Amino acid sequence: MSSPTSKNVSETNGNKPKKSAKTSSNTKGGSMDTRAELADLIKKKAETSEQLANLERQIYAFEGSYLEDTQLCGNIIRGWERYLTSNKATNSKADKRNRKFKEAERLFSKSSITSMAICNPERASESDSITNEDSSDNQISINQNTTTAHDGTTTIKSTPKDEKDSPSHRNEGSVVSGMVSGSTNSGGNKDLLGTPTSNTKSKLSTNSSATAKKSGHINKKIRHR
């Protein structure tokens, strides 16, 4: 006869695979639920974005009609001065011309990035292209500055410290300095030799006057004889 403990062990062993099957089914059901929730959230996001786009279009159109209707008499953006100065008996064609407004006067539409992208996709793309061109130009100028700076550093660092400290480099420097000083001294001596001083000029003038006086005395003696 089998003991009751062996029966309990066999029963527990028989029930184990059933539990694993239940857990696997629960995990599958949970993954399916999360996918369904994610799909619902994506669908709701698309619906809300579409509603927001429609609302932005309505605001854009209403703002344009408001600016056109109040361009002659004044509005909350341009003020109310035109209401007092405007001529009410105007021509219909001139009225239509004057009703045109500038896009810069749009205040509510420009306050939202989504409205600018939805209502004016071409202008949004143009602004993006302009910003990209500006960034590329700035990058090119930065690269040019870095290359010139690198060239300057290479020219400055052409003679390293080891070569400057070497005795050959010192001898070359002393020879060059001696040649420069010698050339300056020789130039100074040439200038001294080439240009007479004031003392030599005075001596020459006195000698010439003395010789002139002697020649005058000799001529007088000859005539007297």
Curated annotation (Swiss-Prot):
Residues 173-189, 197-213 have a biased composition (Low complexity). It is found in: Nucleus. Disulfide bonds: none annotated. Residues 214-225 have a biased composition (Basic residues). Component of the Enok complex composed of at least Br140, enok, Eaf6 and Ing5. Component of the Enok complex which has a histone H3 acetyltransferase activity. Might be involved in transcriptional activation of selected genes. This is Chromatin modification-related protein MEAF6. The gene is Eaf6.
